[in-house]
């Protein structure tokens, strides 16, 4: 949580006391937020519940009771927490109005400062556990509030410290969920068994309503920035046998794959007359030794190999990105460093990265792409994985960025299929001597809805993947007009 007690808070000249009595009611406070910026990371309802009125200037709010003003709200801020910091003697914060029988349409969270309420950012509902009752916890989840009690024991669920244990909870993970169990488990989350709701084993925070472009690590950090697991703190617990349960990663092992290269001096010798752009000393310090084939290197401990180095690439960074479970990496750089690398590097960067061209590493790249929720959704629609991978790689090569929405990916896949189809039929078209006007007419017909023949096609049917109707006609059908398959989902796309 970010808090600036000097720049973002101040005390304002007290207003009319009689007028203040009007705002004892939360509903009356909420009405002042009619023109409050919708882009604010803290919602109007949360601020009103914390005793604030909107001043009409920027995101500045003012307490109706103590008249302290706060502005410059940031993601993760607690409305009640900031209120209490700048005005610890505020009568509202200290429960004066409750003790005197004032009616207050607020959750029990604010009374006597028992809980600290925070807003829900974006479309994700989330909260921390350890509540007095599951009923109250469900209420907080529905209303998008966060309750954070800092004096609790971490991790909240020691039985879920192991990534393998978390993975086992996803046996009944719903098909409609956009993220893969592997990605969620790696981010410290396990399945609660309710809808697509997951929970962090460490901080107890819950997340649900996942969207196609969400990344588990990013959402975990955005909503629970103080989680010890996200921060890379040591949250390992002792098992019944007394052995520490470390966080599990692929390729993690306590003994090095190549003990002969365990020493820096042994690794640096292998580079000889190294002529490549990346610094050989940095490579050796990061655990790598040269294989004598181009710029291929391999880690002595985890056995992970990398090649095709670029001048700007950092060996430690690439080590953490590709082989986060390496024990040597963990010992040298710490869990927080590894977490930050995975939070700041997108899938797109890892796709263009050409790792050592061995079957195992190639499979690792393919697995990474396959786990992308957008890719899985496209496969469900009937698109071929090779076509999806090729389209994503072309996007990265031409624009330098990855797809940010499923709609754009689907549109490009459909466009690529049409291009291929046109290429294959070009020779036949020439042989049949079809006129330019006829070709244009056919292309225009291809874009038209096959039901009304008036509007352009705009909907892909799942699971068959057929693209045949406009949005209006799609609403009237339950089965695909092409193959009669029952439609389970209708995905809107944009045709260029």
UniProtKB/Swiss-Prot annotation:
Zn(2+) binds at residues 299, 302, 319, 326. A zinc finger (RING-type) spans 449-484. Its EC number is 2.3.2.27. BIR repeats lie at residues 26-93, 163-230, 264-329. The keyword Transferase applies. Keywords: Apoptosis, Cytoplasm, Isopeptide bond, Metal-binding, Nucleus, Phosphoprotein, Repeat, S-nitrosylation, Transferase, Ubl conjugation, Ubl conjugation pathway, Wnt signaling pathway, Zinc, Zinc-finger. It is an enzyme of class 2 (transferase). There is a cross-link at residues 321, 327 (Glycyl lysine isopeptide (Lys-Gly) (interchain with G-Cter in ubiquitin)). GO terms for biological process: cellular response to hydrogen peroxide; defense response to bacterium; DNA damage response; negative regulation of apoptotic process; negative regulation of neuron apoptotic process; negative regulation of tumor necrosis factor-mediated signaling pathway; neuron apoptotic process; nucleotide-binding oligomerization domain containing 1 signaling pathway. S-Nitrosylation down-regulates its E3 ubiquitin-protein ligase activity. Signal peptide: none annotated. The modification S-nitrosocysteine is found at residue 449. It is found in: Cytoplasm; Nucleus. GO terms for cellular component: cytoplasm; nucleus; perinuclear region of cytoplasm; protein-containing complex. It catalyses: S-ubiquitinyl-[E2 ubiquitin-conjugating enzyme]-L-cysteine + [acceptor protein]-L-lysine = [E2 ubiquitin-conjugating enzyme]-L-cysteine + N(6)-ubiquitinyl-[acceptor protein]-L-lysine. The keyword Nucleus applies. GO terms for molecular function: cysteine-type endopeptidase inhibitor activity; cysteine-type endopeptidase inhibitor activity involved in apoptotic process; identical protein binding; protease binding; protein serine/threonine kinase binding; scaffold protein binding; ubiquitin protein ligase activity; ubiquitin-protein transferase activity. Gene3D superfamilies: DNA helicase RuvA subunit, C-terminal domain, Inhibitor Of Apoptosis Protein (2mihbC-IAP-1), Chain A, Zinc/RING finger domain, C3HC4 (zinc finger). Belongs to the IAP family. Multi-functional protein which regulates not only caspases and apoptosis, but also modulates inflammatory signaling and immunity, copper homeostasis, mitogenic kinase signaling, cell proliferation, as well as cell invasion and metastasis. Acts as a direct caspase inhibitor. Directly bind to the active site pocket of CASP3 and CASP7 and obstructs substrate entry. Inactivates CASP9 by keeping it in a monomeric, inactive state. Monomer, and homodimer. Interacts (via BIR3 domain) with DIABLO/SMAC; the interaction inhibits apoptotic suppressor activity. Interacts with HTRA2/PRSS25; the interaction inhibits apoptotic suppressor activity. Interacts with TAB1/MAP3K7IP1 and AIFM1. Interaction with DIABLO/SMAC hinders binding of TAB1/MAP3K7IP1 and AIFM1. Interacts with TCF25 and COMMD1. Interacts (via BIR3 domain) with SEPTIN4. Interacts with RIP1, RIP2, RIP3, RIP4, CCS and USP19. Interacts (via BIR 2 domain and BIR 3 domain) with HAX1 (via C-terminus) and this interaction blocks ubiquitination of XIAP/BIRC4. The first BIR domain is involved in interaction with TAB1/MAP3K7IP1 and is important for dimerization. The second BIR domain is sufficient to inhibit caspase-3 and caspase-7, while the third BIR is involved in caspase-9 inhibition. The interactions with DIABLO/SMAC and HTRA2/PRSS25 are mediated by the second and third BIR domains. This is E3 ubiquitin-protein ligase XIAP. It comes from Rattus norvegicus (Rat).
């Amino acid at each position: 949580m970010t808090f600036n007690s000097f720049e973002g808070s101040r005390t304002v000249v007290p207003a009319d006391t009689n007028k203040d009595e009007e705002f004892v009611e939360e509903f009356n406070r909420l009405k002042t937020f009619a023109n409050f910026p919708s882009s604010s990371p803290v919602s109007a309802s949360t601020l009103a519940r914390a005793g604030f009125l909107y001043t009409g200037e920027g995101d500045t709010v003012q307490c109706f009771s103590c008249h302290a003003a706060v502005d410059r709200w940031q993601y993760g801020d607690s409305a009640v927490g900031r209120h209490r910091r700048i005005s610890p003697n505020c009568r509202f914060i200290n429960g004066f109005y409750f003790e005197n029988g004032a009616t207050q349409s607020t959750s029990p969270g604010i009374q006597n400062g028992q809980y600290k309420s925070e807003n829900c950012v974006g479309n994700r509902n989330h909260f921390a556990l350890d509540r007095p009752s599951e009923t109250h916890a469900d209420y907080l989840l529905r209303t998008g509030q966060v309750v954070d009690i800092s004096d609790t024991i971490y991790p909240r669920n020691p039985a879920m410290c192991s990534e393998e244990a978390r993975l086992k909870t996803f046996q009944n993970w719903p098909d409609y969920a956009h993220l893969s169990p592997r990605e969620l488990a790696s981010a410290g989350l396990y399945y609660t068994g309710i809808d697509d709701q997951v929970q962090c084993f460490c901080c107890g925070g819950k997340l649900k309503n996942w969207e196609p472009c969400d990344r588990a690590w990013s959402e975990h950090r955005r909503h629970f920035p103080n989680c010890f697991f996200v921060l890379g703190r040591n949250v390992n617990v002792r098992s019944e046998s007394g052995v520490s349960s470390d966080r599990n990663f692929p390729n993690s092992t306590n003994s090095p794959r190549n003990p002969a290269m365990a020493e820096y001096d042994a690794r640096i010798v292998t580079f000889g007359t190294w002529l490549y752009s990346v610094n050989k000393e940095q490579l050796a310090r990061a655990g790598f030794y040269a294989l004598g084939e181009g710029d291929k290197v391999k880690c002595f401990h985890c056995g992970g190999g990398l090649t095709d180095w670029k001048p700007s690439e950092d060996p430690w960074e690439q080590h953490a990105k590709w082989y986060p479970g390496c024990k040597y990496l963990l010992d040298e750089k710490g869990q927080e460093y590894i977490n930050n690398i995975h939070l700041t590097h997108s899938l797109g960067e890892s796709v263009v990265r050409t790792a050592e061209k061995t079957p195992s590493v190639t499979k690792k790249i393919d697995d990474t792409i396959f786990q992308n929720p957008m890719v899985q959704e496209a496969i469900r629609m009937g698109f071929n994985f090779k076509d999806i991978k090729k389209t994503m790689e072309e996007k990265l090569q031409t624009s330098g960025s990855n797809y940010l929405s499923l709609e754009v990916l689907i549109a490009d896949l459909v466009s690529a299929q049409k291009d291929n189809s046109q290429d294959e039929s070009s020779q036949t078209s020439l042989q049949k001597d079809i006129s330019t006007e006829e070709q244009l007419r056919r292309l225009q017909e291809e874009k038209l809805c096959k039901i009304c023949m008036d509007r352009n096609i705009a909907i892909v049917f799942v699971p068959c993947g057929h693209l045949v109707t406009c949005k209006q006609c799609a609403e009237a059908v339950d089965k695909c007009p092409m193959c009669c398959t029952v439609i389970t989902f209708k995905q809107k796309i944009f045709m260029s």
